[in-house]
UniProtKB/Swiss-Prot annotation:
Residues 1-85 form the YcgL domain. Transmembrane segments: none annotated. PANTHER family: PROTEIN YCGL. The lineage of its organism: Bacteria, Pseudomonadati, Pseudomonadota, Gammaproteobacteria, Alteromonadales. PROSITE patterns: YCGL. It comes from Shewanella sediminis (strain HAW-EB3). This is YcgL domain-containing protein Ssed_2518.
């Protein structure tokens, strides 16, 4: 299985995996509007891979088969100040 990977012009670090290059029929219209004009990043062969950088390869494969697309969103940003406060036990109360 080879899929096409597109990055979003609107959402930083958001990627859309689709079954075929320039085929977005199975992607919901609302998602395409939110994603914006897709920029092709690469054609990615999935059959010989056992992992991807930030996505679960098995989830990517299953969602491509079931839905025709997989949306990879960036991990949530960590508030380092709040994390540090928790680590040192700081509380306003």
């Amino acid at each position: 299985m080879i899929c096409a990977v597109y990055k979003s012009r609107r959402k930083v670090d958001s990627y859309l995996f689709v079954e075929k290059r320039n085929v977005f029929e199975r992607v919901p219209d609302a998602l395409m509007k939110m994603f914006g004009e897709p920029d092709l990043v690469m054609m990615l062969p999935l059959m010989k891979r056992d992992h991807l950088g930030f996505a679960d390869i098995n989830k990517v494969k299953s969602e491509l088969a079931e839905k025709g697309y997989y949306l990879q969103l960036p991990p949530p940003k960590v508030n380092l100040l709040e994390q540090h406060k928790l680590e040192i036990g700081y509380s306003r109360d």
